[in-house]
């Protein structure tokens, strides 16, 4: 068996969960309600207060400096739905940490609550806290140069509106995408017109490889990343001291909003490039393969300001993000930071970033960058040192408990976003892969089969529950969660197993310093108690319009149901008349491949259309039969083959189970 369970089991599970909400909290029927911090958790969090310099308020001064207009309200979409809500986090302000939150994380969450329009210096502004990312606004001779357009059209418009309430209204003459993550380009269409970009009226700068990586990350593995991203950001969890408080580099992600993408018209290809736009001097430093595959820093010589994008935020970053992505190169990352320090350190008075707040003062900037460099170099070198001594990825994570020397006491290197243990595992994965070399781990059972065997070996469900309760009583929540995971995957209808595992996950969430870990624990606990939320807050995405035809067919190859497609061999020619581009698709052995710039003379059918027509069909604004009837799609050959082909495609839903077997 796999992680899948039958629909009948799922119905039984739902019935038992409903019944459990009516039950008394007896030992045999664990409560589904959220719990307070245990005495063990409260004591552990109190201990944190003794070990970190909480009297140091320098970062609060840095975060508040230059504040023109605070923001603590909501952003809504055209339908009146809430997209962004800073008001939900006001419980954090001017209060000591609750015992259900690690005090260090509470400290970071309070800093991320400082939102609004800020003046970095005359003619240079930032909007922070209206989106996961910052919008940096530079006033040129006659217009504005923007660095990053935030995640959504709605938040981008709101950020620019806030700026215009306090500064002269000038046209946007240029946009810079610092890198290929959606929170830095997804709002573009909300504030610039694509026609102006195509006409050259607005310059859009981006690092080399931007479109390939922006689209591949958000489209090809998009559904899986989106679902895992719900766990990482805690977006489905309520806000509060017993729920979601922060995401380390920002508060959470936007909901009910529109992701867009306007293709750049200026690509930065050289390691260092200088451009001047509307009197604003921009010096770009390519940092490909650092925090993103397509990435760059921006130096502003007129201001003596270095913008390190997401390459040196005031928290440890992820070498392998929990939502899923390509593993990042810590050695290269450290090298890029050192190159920035060497080239710009003596010429920089202020360091700004596309998350969080600035670093003020040249000496502090130089120390900050050196510390950031040392941290990523340590992660790489220490993991390699230990793996060459024979330690495996989990052993390495257990061996290294803190950063060396003074690094461990620097607020801006704490594990609020990336975590020390997961980053060390990521380095291991980069060099050696997921397999630890032990043949016992070469071909493990999948979770359902493993769970059943473990439960049987331990003497049955009651014996496992007894062990879980004993572990919880001792504060050994990690062990309780591991035991519970086996039991839930063996028997997802076991309400006591679900409740106990949720309780243990919740206590781990209360204890962790890492915001993403907390969000994942809280989301897991919520879904164990109540199931996967049925509502959809994803909003709309216009990312599909940015797909080139070959990217679109890559996506179809992923969506193809191989089991259904076997025995349906065919060839399909596609002619994009506006692009002057031909593509031949071959379906063979249940596998779809393509040849760009080629047509098969023996194709079953040839499809002629334009890229805008494909965009409409892909967005489900136009169906294929209507397009054929209208003449916007022309067929030559056996048209039934086209319908047969589309009938072989899967659809994906970002509501699949994670903490229990798939349905």
UniProtKB/Swiss-Prot annotation:
Coiled coil: none annotated. This is (R)-specific secondary-alkylsulfatase. Its EC number is 3.1.6.19. InterPro entries: Alkyl/aryl-sulf_dimr_sf, Alkyl_sulf_C, Alkyl_sulf_dimr, Bact_Alkyl/Aryl-Sulfatase, Bds1/SdsA1_MBL-fold, Metallo-B-lactamas, RibonucZ/Hydroxyglut_hydro, SCP2_sterol-bd_dom_sf. Belongs to the metallo-beta-lactamase superfamily. Type III sulfatase family. It comes from Pseudomonas sp. The keyword Kinase does not apply. Residues 1-28 form the signal peptide.
